[in-house]
Amino acid sequence: MGRRWGFLIGFLVAVGLLGLGHGEQQPSETAAQRCFCQVSGYLDDCTCDVETIDKFNNYRLFPRLQKLLESDYFRYYKVNLKRPCPFWNDINQCGRRDCAVKPCHSDEVPDGIKSASYKYSEEANNLIEECEQAERLGAVDESLSEETQKAVLQWTKHDDSSDNFCEVDDIQSPDAEYVDLLLNPERYTGYKGPDAWKIWNVIYEENCFKPQTIKRPLNPLASGQGKSEENTFYSWLEGLCVEKRAFYRLISGLHASINVHLSARYLLQDTWLEKKWGHNITEFQQRFDGILTEGEGPRRLKNLYFLYLIELRALSKVVPFFERPDFQLFTGNKDQDAENKMLLLEILHEIKSFPLHFDENSFFAGNKKEANKLKEDFRLHFRNISRIMDCVGCLKCRLWGKLQTQGLGTALKILFSEKLIANMPESGPSYEFHLTRQEIVSLFNAFGRISTSVKELENFRNLLQNIH
């Protein structure tokens, strides 16, 4: 009997040991876990968590924002895609059909948008146009009141001032054309390889406050990188002041957002009958899987959420500008313009209600002289990045790169103009702070792109859930 029990116990122990030996074959991580397991909880330098952003964006904000961006005021963007690259001459233009941009015919753009000046209210537009015409004729228009003349001069001065974070296009240039953003969506174009790497390499290596001795992880144009270089990079990054660290994270977040779009609207099928665009899971994994990217992918996605919070905060700060009664989304269609302003204000008030906004008061909060110097460096670095967009060889990528950098630049301009916004009069001309139509269109479309990225992350998370 004892021998039988001994045999049975031995058998059970053996089975147990076999089970332990196969412990490695327990259900492995899903692809979703490898991409998103670290993209949760609180974000660095923030008091907000990823889950709160997902819920707020995907269910309360995203649907209404998409409706607004489909309106005439926001779908037409004037851009000069023929500006020469200011940094190098050997640009390889992408010859693929999907890289091309189809500009609008003049009769496709609403008259109110095409008018000579469309930055402000209809009344202000007329006044500015009269002033510009008088200036061209070398005459003094005495019909304009002293207050109006002062306002016009302030507006003009402000547009040419040094507080802009972007190198903006001259929209009066004959090379500047209106583009319908809905007909030229941001998606995969096939523009990749050394030419695309060069753009991002210049942005990261020369414009993110990084010394040449610090090597960026997974840089395709650098060789012989290992774990020690990665550790050195993040030790350097954590040692930066909060402003410079935020700058890097904004650029990384923008890069990540663009890669999400390209993975979500990938050319899956191209036949003479039709083109089929959709989610490319493999492409997404190559860019964001924690194992395939040696831990970089999840970091990039967290930086995307950081970028979302920065632009969300800017929109909450600029609400008073859009609430002013003389501001309108002027296209010439009064009923539609009024409806769109109501929708715009609904969205902005929803944004203002977000409970965990980024606290920008920690920015530039030290010694005033040092803070001003740092702020100017911040502005000049970002302005330089906006100029690099003219070096992108794919015209559609250039279009969306210029729009999104101008949008982020406008968000930064808002965050650094808090006192000017607070001092705006409730009605009448605003001497110190205003936004041009170009800035408004780029601001909301850029945020729309980031909002779409956050929504697409939910889609990819669901698609990857059952893949190992």
From Swiss-Prot:
Main location: endoplasmic reticulum
Activity regulation description: Enzyme activity is tightly regulated to prevent the accumulation of reactive oxygen species in the endoplasmic reticulum. Reversibly down-regulated by the formation of disulfide bonds between the active site Cys-94 and Cys-131, and between Cys-99 and Cys-104. Glutathione may be required to regulate its activity in the endoplasmic reticulum.
Organism annotation: Bos taurus
PTM info: The Cys-94/Cys-99 and Cys-394/Cys-397 disulfide bonds constitute the redox-active center. The Cys-94/Cys-99 disulfide bond may accept electron from P4HB and funnel them to the active site disulfide Cys-394/Cys-397. The regulatory Cys-99/Cys-104 disulfide bond stabilizes the other regulatory bond Cys-94/Cys-131. Phosphorylated on Ser-145 by FAM20C in the Golgi which increases its enzymatic activity. Phosphorylation is induced by lactation. It is also induced by hypoxia and reductive stress.
UniProt topology in membrane: Peripheral membrane protein
Enzyme nomenclature, EC number: 1.8.4.-
Record GO terms (molecular function): FAD binding; oxidoreductase activity; protein-disulfide reductase activity; thiol oxidase activity
Database matches in InterPro entries: Ero1, ERO1-like_sf
Disulfide bond entries: 35-48, 37-46, 85-391, 94-99, 94-131, 99-104, 208-241, 394-397
Oligomer and partners: Predominantly monomer. May function both as a monomer and a homodimer. Interacts with PDILT. Interacts with ERP44; the interaction results in retention of ERO1A in the endoplasmic reticulum.
Keywords assigned: Apoptosis, Cell projection, Disulfide bond, Electron transport, Endoplasmic reticulum, FAD, Flavoprotein, Glycoprotein, Golgi apparatus, Membrane, Oxidoreductase, Phosphoprotein, Redox-active center, Secreted, Signal, Transport
Cellular component annotations (GO), alphabetically ordered: dendrite; endoplasmic reticulum; endoplasmic reticulum membrane; extracellular space; Golgi lumen
Identification of the protein by name: ERO1-like protein alpha
Gene: ERO1A
Glycan-linked positions: 280, 384
Names of required cofactors: FAD
Functional note: Oxidoreductase involved in disulfide bond formation in the endoplasmic reticulum. Efficiently reoxidizes P4HB/PDI, the enzyme catalyzing protein disulfide formation, in order to allow P4HB to sustain additional rounds of disulfide formation. Following P4HB reoxidation, passes its electrons to molecular oxygen via FAD, leading to the production of reactive oxygen species (ROS) in the cell. Required for the proper folding of immunoglobulins. Plays an important role in ER stress-induced, CHOP-dependent apoptosis by activating the inositol 1,4,5-trisphosphate receptor IP3R1.
Signal peptide range: 1-23
Family stated for the protein in its record: Belongs to the EROs family.
